[in-house]
Amino acid sequence: MLMAGKKLTAQSGSYRIFRWLPLLVLLLATATTAQTPPKARLPESSIKTVYVIPTSHYDFGFVEPPDQVRERAARHIDEVLRMAESDPDFRWTIESVWQVNEWLKRQKPASSVLPKDNAKIARLMSLIKSGRIALSTAWGSMHTDFMGAEELNRLCYDYTVLKRTYGVESQLALMDDVPGHPTSIPSVLANSGTKYLVTGLNLFLSSATDLAPGKVPFYWQSPDGSKVLIWISQGKRGGYVEGMTDFYLDPYSLDPYTNKTPYEMFNPNAGPKTDLQKMEEGITELLNRYNGGGYKYDSVMVMYAHDFVEPTNVKNLEKAVALWNNNHPEIQLKIATPPEFFHVIESKYQAQIPTYKGEFSGLWSEAKTQSPLISGLARFAHEQTPAAESLWSALSMTRSIPFPVGNMSSLYDWMFTYDEHSGAGNTGWIQLNDRGLLEEQNRQYVRYMKDARAEVENLFSRGLSLAAQPTRYDQPFKQASANEFNLLVYNGLSWSRTDVVQVKSPHDGQKIVGISDAATKQSLAFDTDANGQTFFLAKDVPSFGYKTFTVTTATGQSVSTLTALPRSTEASNTNYRVRLRPDGNVQSIYDVRSNREIINDKGELPFNELLRVEGANAARVPVPNSPVITVRKGKLLTEISVERAQAAFSSTVVRIYDGLERAEISNSIDGSRLPFPGGSGNWSDNYYFSFPFSVSKDNLKIMRGGQKWFDTLPDDYLSGARKDSVTTQHLIGLTDGNATAMLAHRQAFHFAYAGFVNTKLLPKGAPQEFPAMYTGKFPLPEATVYSHAFRHTEQADTHDLGVVNMATVEPGLGDRYLFDYAIRAGGKWDAVKAWHFGAEFNLPLRAAYVDVPPSQPTRSFFDINQPNVQIVSIKPLSDTVVHGEVSATPLDPQLNKRYTIRLQEFTGRATEVRINLPVRIKSATRMNLTEDVELEKLASISPLTVRLEPFATATILIEIEPGK
């Protein structure tokens, strides 16, 4: 034997040492083993493989203003690309499409004017195509129950753009943090080509569903029959962070907020532990959690994520996985993407996977009550944007004018940004935010929504003007009198309607003295209020169309036509009789035609009372002076006003109109007079308007008006879902099977149920009660809903300065809040009547003065023949709207020839619907929701006829014959 170039002999000292070397090695190994703790015995379980899913959770806002987060996300994708190219075992899931969008915007070489760095882009897309990087099809982690109906339909549109442009494919949606979603989500995802949904649900406030962890994955089905295979990771520490904070799969990486490992954070007194011991504790927790739920499959998915973490953490995860797999062959860890896990589960267990239906919105959209003015602007954009889009589609078809796709793209991007789960003007998280960044975040949210409102108003202003604009072939128009003005009234809904129009005199110093129908010349009754606002009833304004009226003026200031009724607190017309209490709250709204009282004067609180809740404790809003109640009556309008001098709840106006089946309530809040919040261990106060209805509590159902249909609650809740409150689109209904009350709402959107809100003032010194939201239950004690108007906070506990007083979280919007409601009663629940009522209140008739009246005084651009179907939007086909090419030769305007019509059946009744269009069409095809897959060629195109199944959303592609 040779050692160091020398021959060893039996006589050499080196040989004697070498002869004892095996024994020394054995002794050292024995000593080391004695110091190493034995491997833990894990609980018995069906689970043999844990699929670990690395990703990073991004919030718009939260730690930085949205625009800075966009920059951060772009840098993050660069790091994902670098890590993937340097490590062949690297796996990653990109949480949101918006992150890729932001990265793509910045992929431009310094020497380039327009062309992008296509080689670099191709590298990322190649990794996505290979499956090593998974891409969510969802734009972001959204407050899905707050989103507008058409906005929600476009949740996966930007993914489809990536698919069409770069050839990437994904069947996975990932939405984290938000603890639940409404019943419309499976429909939207499945009809966009998405098969799988992963949700990391944050339960730090309340529950999501008790189907996790035992019953996951399951097929989650919408009322229309669409379904997705959903995996739910949920937990009090965040859900999506479970791999790091619950199961300790990575004992090396640091928590992004504390600079400690999660194990150190949650086990400060644990004492010295080896890395393997920490992991064993975590895996034991994982197995116990799933065993306790009755989990039966051999594989499980664990999300490995945290806020804004970088993909470099995967190196630590790989180290930890290798350590574990070398020591515990009985349960193996596998770094993967969600599709890998889903494919395994479906291949083995598809026949055993259950299907569940139900609503389980976590109701985090309540956070948007912190900025009620911004949220009101967002809801305005939700309704008005599809209406403006449909108007401009009609103009594009009939006027041969390019469709303004860029305006619509901006509008939807602003809405998506605010409707993402961090979107709200707020005072930040305790000790997290720097003051300057927090204030800039709030300014940006205000800017987005103010820009959205301005964009919408410009689209309608120019669009309605264009609708009336004569062509060069029309005869010149001469106004009969300089005191006559042409008023075009537009209906942005897909059914003819009679509704109130509000308009002011076209010029200062002139008053309206007459209004007539331009076609029939019939004079119309109207009223003018003390603010110079004129009201009249426009009858039978056609679907997606207009009627023209002639307004006659005279010199002079506007004077109210309403007559005050002295010392009265009661008013009536042919439909309603309204009576107020001396304190200004509503005592009675009586439906004359149905001989039915609508409100319950014996409820927990009076109708329309403003309730303040300090922390979890009920309080009253001070009213220093007795309210002044005035009743005014005119030819059309009857109103009761309540003025509360020097009070935060400054005024209420109740309006009823002859010929209109609704009573309206407008509540004004003077934010400058709100009490300073705090003093009860709380940072904020919550304000609710109380609406007790005269509907029996027996067999009481809450009808939740969503984006696509009504959910019946509590029947339609997913098992274990949060049941204390609900977010609705246009209307919330209450029915006992015989009597119904309907409450439509504009700015407010979140409602709590009776029994889930503290309404009783406790005596001073009384022991604190457990918050009502945790003790309320179904069946409800009465038919009352509390409209959560706003959350009021004035102090922020900042990271850099400590506690600061903030003058506002909505800079530039002022401190006057307006909350509009409309009330209507009925017998048995009528989904068509309720849907139309809510939609009409949220999209009022729009009036515009035009210089020249349109050649047709009344016109409908689009209409349908079924009342249970709505045209949600009409727009150019998505793959024809953005070209991104530059020509050296100036081009003529490129006209749109292909459009899509979005239809929604909202009652659950199969139907055949006929659609009338302003142009002839060459062909029609039924498409999927994202407009990239043909489903069916339609044979009946003259007129266009479509068969709809119950609750179906249909996207119909038409190719028009321009000019015909």
Set out the residue ranges of the language-model regions.
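C-terminal (or distal) subdomains of carbohydrate-active enzymes
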Residues: 185-190, 200-204, 214-216, 248-255, ...
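Bacterial N-terminal signal peptides
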Residues: 19-29
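Surface-exposed loop and adjacent secondary-structure segments within mature catalytic domains
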Residues: 122-136, 150, 182-259
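N-terminal secretory signal peptides that target proteins for export/translocation
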Residues: 1-17
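CE4/NodB-like, metal-dependent polysaccharide N-deacetylase domain
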Residues: 152-179, 183-191, 285-301, 944
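Catalytic grooves of carbohydrate-active enzymes
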Residues: 52-63, 68, 226-475, 479, ...
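The substrate-binding groove and active-site-proximal loops of carbohydrate-active enzymes
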Residues: 56-72, 95-96, 103-113, 137-152, ...
